[in-house]
Amino acid sequence: AITTGRMKPEEKDLFKHLDWMYWGEWINVLSQYHVGVQLGTAAAGTFNLNCSFHGIPCIAYSNSNTQKTLHPNTTVELGDIVRAKKIANRLKDEDFYNKCSQETKRLFEEKYSERVFVNHVKNIMESLDETN
């Protein structure tokens, strides 16, 4: 597992810590990993989103919208470490891993791809034009 940004002292020997880096470098570094784990405080949900971009299954809590949307088979309830461990072990099964990987890629394309974003912004701009 890796961490970026702020590392807690008790994590020193548990995780490989990556120094802060620009997003362009980060997204390339992330692509080298097989599974994402985000069992900490939920924030903007970008880690879950970035994992999905690469087709990397992410085990995380259900209090992140991007997690619930993009990784339905690897989402656990807040604090459910037992289920998170079971999912981590299940991801060792190639068929389950591939199912999760393909599903998150598909969901990313449907919900968060550049095409979806551009259409969303276009709709907003058109609705603003209609109100003026």
Q: Which ranges hold each PLM region?
A:
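Short alpha-helical segment that forms part of, or immediately flanks, the ligand-binding pocket
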Residues: I27, T46-H54, Q67
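Acidic donor-binding loop of glycosyltransferase active sites
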Residues: S31-A43, I56
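A charged, aromatic-enriched C-terminal amphipathic alpha-helix characteristic of glycosyltransferases
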Residues: K92-E126
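Short, hydrophobic beta-strand segments that form beta-sheet elements in well-ordered domains
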Residues: A1-R6, G36, C58-A60
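Short glycine-rich donor-binding/catalytic loop of glycosyltransferases
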Residues: T41, I56, A60-Q67
